[in-house]
């Protein structure tokens, strides 16, 4: 009788113990391919630190310095802090050669949207996960631009529940817009893009919604477009279970519009917080691919 052995999970460190970092921790711990060996922040009273300790995960208030000290026991670093901090953290991690998956909108290197370019990202040390709105909307925008061939203008409007948008995310709004627009231009080959972020204070919180609109003088085969976005929905749903199209592509004159919704798994925040899930699930997918086991 042969005994099949399974490689040990990839040992990860998470820097940032806020909303995104804590949701990421729960998803990493749920993955058979990953484990969190260090959850590092700066505030001892952080609810994320308390949750991690309760789950038996090693924690530190030493931030990136704690990661450097434990580097020999870490295979990959996730950054869930802020754009400004991520720039400094990458400067420290880069010489160590550790893979670095950045969930902030710092945008210091290769964009990674798993549904679009995961295979191209496997050998990159640094990966930018763009933004939550970018992960949700850019793949659908690309479907439109690929079929149209040329668009004159592309706009993405993302709406998220206020309670799920933490202090670091609020401090990064300019970077969020800039990075989402850069990723849209890169993946969709369009020069005129606009990103709008709406933080909705409604209680109970709204489910994350993303609307994509394009203006083009090209005639688009609407049936072909619907087939394309349905295939893309299925691809994204494979790693973000709550992702779905709620308004299929419609045409009004030279404008084409569709809307997607992202419902979270409810791991840390209520299920309405799909803006957390879309980027943490994408980051986990990228890390799992790095383990060599997803392939």
UniProtKB/Swiss-Prot annotation:
One Pfam family per UniProt: AcetDehyd-dimer
Gene3D superfamilies: Dihydrodipicolinate Reductase, domain 2, NAD(P)-binding Rossmann-like Domain
Single GO biological process annotation from the record: catabolic process
Keywords: Aromatic hydrocarbons catabolism, NAD, Oxidoreductase
EC id: 1.2.1.10
Residues noted as binding NAD(+) in the record, renumbered to the chain: 17-20, 164-172, 275
UniProt protein name: Acetaldehyde dehydrogenase 2
């Amino acid at each position: 009788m042969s005994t099949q052995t399974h490689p040990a999970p990839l040992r990860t460190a998470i820097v940032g113990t806020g909303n995104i970092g804590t949701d990421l921790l729960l998803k990493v711990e749920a993955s058979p391919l990953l484990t969190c060996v260090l959850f590092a922040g700066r505030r001892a009273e952080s609810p994320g630190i308390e949750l991690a300790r309760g789950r038996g995960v090693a924690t530190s208030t030493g931030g990136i310095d704690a990661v450097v000290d434990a580097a020999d026991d870490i295979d990959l670093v996730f950054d869930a802090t802020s754009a400004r901090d991520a720039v400094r953290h990458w400067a420290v991690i880069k010489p160590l050669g550790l893979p670095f998956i950045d969930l902030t909108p710092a945008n210091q290197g290769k964009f990674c949207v798993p549904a679009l370019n995961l295979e191209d990202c496997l050998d990159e040390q640094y990966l930018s996960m763009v933004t939550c709105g970018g992960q949700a909307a850019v793949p659908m925008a690309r479907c439109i631009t690929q079929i149209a061939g040329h668009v004159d203008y592309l706009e993405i409007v993302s709406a998220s529940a206020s309670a799920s948008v933490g202090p670091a995310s609020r401090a990064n709004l300019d970077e969020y817009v800039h990075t989402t627009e850069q990723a849209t231009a890169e993946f969709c080959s369009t020069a005129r893009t606009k990103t709008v972020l709406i933080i909705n204070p409604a209680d109970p919180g709204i489910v994350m919604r993303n609307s994509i609109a394009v203006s083009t003088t090209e005639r688009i085969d609407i049936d072909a477009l619907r087939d394309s976005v349905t295939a893309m929905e299925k691809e994204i749903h494979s790693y973000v279970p709550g992702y779905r199209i709620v308004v299929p592509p419609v045409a009004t004159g030279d404008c084409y519009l569709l809307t997607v919704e992202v419902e979270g798994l409810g791991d840390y925040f209520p299920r309405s917080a799909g803006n957390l899930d879309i980027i943490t699930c994408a980051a986990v997918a990228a890390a799992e691919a790095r383990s060599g086991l997803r392939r």
